């Protein structure tokens, strides 16, 4: 069911909860809530002193560089994977980032809440939680998360590339999100809080599309980028950012 829904997103970058008007056409789930609805602040699991720091341009640049590097080498056939015929370079999307930030403000890694946006009906999601007596810098947390997701390549096989497995996640979902050729955009958020003497942080990225069981993670080709209308000038094994990909198909 598709409805035009009007709601207010609270700023993921401020403890003052500044209202930001946002109009989205969302795909309303029959069960469960949208993460952007009735989200008045931090969740019950956030302990004390929760904060959602802003991700600056240097953080965004790093996420895009590392993610597109990985997509590029996978498209070329690294890790014994098939070459990708039409894998696009990723760009940052503010709507996906806002909803990722709202997700982290719940301080729970996995939820069933809908995260659709006007452009993207069924975004994928990857989360990473870290805790300790002290926390690393935001940049280090982002690096640790991307490395953790990347290492799932050891669980992702050529067979999985051709047909995303159904059932319980076997430690491959996050790597599959990173290299899906339906994904064109990414947006991330970070929240940290305290539980007694322990400090915790949750980093989440939303992807513009999610993998569907039984469908390929990406379309293989005899060589990389053979079906791109135009390749990216730097990531030459990836399609340019204006490649016409249908993320909702």
Curated annotation (Swiss-Prot):
Q: What is its main location?
A: secreted
Stretches assigned to the SCP domain: 64-207
The UniProt GO MF terms for this protein read:
toxin activity
Q: Which CDD domains match?
A: CAP_euk
Q: Which SUPFAM superfamilies did the record assign?
A: PR-1-like (SSF55797)
Signal peptide positions on this chain: 1-23
Motif extent (Cell attachment site): 31-33, 220-222
Summed up, the tissue specificity of this protein is: Expressed in salivary glands.
Tell me the function of this protein: Inhibits platelet aggregation induced by all agonists tested (ADP, arachidonic acid, the thromboxane A2 analog U46619, thrombin, and snake venom snaclecs (TMVA that activates platelet through GPIB, and stejnulxin that specifically acts through GPVI (GP6))). May act by competing with fibrinogen for binding to glycoprotein IIb/IIIa (ITGA2B/ITGB3).
Q: What is this protein called?
A: Tabinhibitin 4
What lineage is this protein's organism placed in?
Eukaryota, Metazoa, Ecdysozoa, Arthropoda, Hexapoda
């Amino acid at each position: 069911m598709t409805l035009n829904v009007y709601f207010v997103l609270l700023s993921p970058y401020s403890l003052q909860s500044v209202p930001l008007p946002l109009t989205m056409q969302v795909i309303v789930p029959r069960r469960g809530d949208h993460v952007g609805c009735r989200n008045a602040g931090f969740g019950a699991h956030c302990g004390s002193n929760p904060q959602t720091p802003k991700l600056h341009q240097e953080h965004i640049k790093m996420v895009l560089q590392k993610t597109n590097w990985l997509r590029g080498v996978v498209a070329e056939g690294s890790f014994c994977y098939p070459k990708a015929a039409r894998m696009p370079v990723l760009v940052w999307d503010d709507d996906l980032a806002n909803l990722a930030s709202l997700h982290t403000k719940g301080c729970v890694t996995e939820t069933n809440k809908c995260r659709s946006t006007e452009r993207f009906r069924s975004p994928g999601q990857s989360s990473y939680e870290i805790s300790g007596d002290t926390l690393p810098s935001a940049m280090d947390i982002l690096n640790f998360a991307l490395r953790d997701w990347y290492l799932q390549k050891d669980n992702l096989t050529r067979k999985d590339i051709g047909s995303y497995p159904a059932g319980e996640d076997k430690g491959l979902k996050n790597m599959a999100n990173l290299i899906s050729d339906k994904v064109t955009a990414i947006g991330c958020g970070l929240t940290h809080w305290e539980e007694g003497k322990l400090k915790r942080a949750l980093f989440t990225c939303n992807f513009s599309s999610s993998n569907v069981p039984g469908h390929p993670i990406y379309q293989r080709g005899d060589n990389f980028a053979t079906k791109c209308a135009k390749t990216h000038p730097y990531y030459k094994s990836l399609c340019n950012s204006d490649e016409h990909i249908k993320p909702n198909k």
